[in-house]
Amino acid sequence: MGYEPGDVVSGFTLPNANGGGDLSLDDVMTEVGAVVVFECNHCPYVVGSINRINKAAAKAEELGMGFVGINSNDAAVYSEDSFDNMVKRAEKGMPYPYLYDESQDVATAWGAKRTPEFYLVNGEGVVAVSYTHLT
């Protein structure tokens, strides 16, 4: 089913293609909250929205919020979405962490089915707004 506004989210820890090592939701969250966006490398909607996503990340930072991208696609189905290709994309100047949900457990828990999908989580870990299934 996934998270709806008012739901408390569960944490996660995933490998970060933009800076190495694992990163958790707690690492991203601030006392104000965070934006979590499910995205990938191959999706034309994501590719066409990269500038807007980067602007959203900059605005989140300006407001004191965390921002993180999560790729949950199966690299066996979409080779462009492999961790190595995520690293290559991040190296081109991605201004936020880009995490790999290889098992798709996080996407399943959050209810993310398409890309991009955005969740605004407040400082208490409660979904304030979700922009999902827009395509």
Give residue spans per PLM region.
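Short, internal strand/loop/helix patches
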Residues: V87-T115, Y119-V121
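Structural microenvironment flanking redox-active thiols in thiol-disulfide oxidoreductases
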Residues: G48-E91, V106
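Short, glycine-anchored, charge-dense loop/turn motifs used at functional sites
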Residues: F118-S130
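Short, thiol/selenol-centered motifs that function as redox-active sites or metal-ligating centers
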Residues: C40-N51, F118
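N-terminal "domain-start" segment that seeds a small globular fold
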Residues: M1-D26
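Short loop/turn microsegments at loop-to-beta-strand junctions
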Residues: V9-S10, A34, T115-E117
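Short active-site neighborhood of thiol/selenol oxidoreductases, capturing the structured segment around
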Residues: V28-P44
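Conserved small/polar residues in nucleotide/adenosyl-binding loops
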Residues: T132-T135
